[in-house]
Amino acid sequence: MQCARRGSPSGGPIDETPPKVVRLEPNQKTLNFNSDRIRIYFDEYIKLNELRDQLVVSPPLEQSKYLISPQGLPAKYLQIEFTDSLPSNTTYTFNFGQSIVDNNEGNVLPFYKYIFSTGSSLDSLSISGQINDAIKRNPDSFVSVMLYPYDSVFTDSIIFKDKPIYYTNTLDSLKEFTIENLKSGKYMLV
């Protein structure tokens, strides 16, 4: 018979897998959305990194109209709670960029999107492109791409007075962008 030896457990292989979505309340691409919250459940504890810089909501919502948790503490779900009613017949996209990471290793769930509509259909148009700079060979790696409605009230100063209806960012080195779930109409791309 021998005495136990002191030591630390060796652990296992390093986790290189990003978090996986296991359940949604309500489901992705829900129509006639009328709930006051959305919950996205994961297979492991997650945390949100740089949410303020990474999250893109299209069309934009005032930050006072929704709260996102967890912030600061790990959890097995992400919650979007609405503090005010949403306009009808609108398709919303919450793009989390690279903010959703697992708690232990920091593996990123890249560009996870949650999409829903307050109307009876989802807007399905999209636009994509690549950023080029006429002066520099290499454009900045972080570029904002914005769409403004091009209608009877459009003026060339709209970009200084109003927020864009849709926007995205080039958050990686590819300098490519895509904006999806657009409502049919004319837009100015900035």
Model-derived regions, located:
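Acidic, low-complexity Ser/Thr/Gly/Pro-rich repeat segments typical of extracellular/periplasmic
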Residues: 2-190
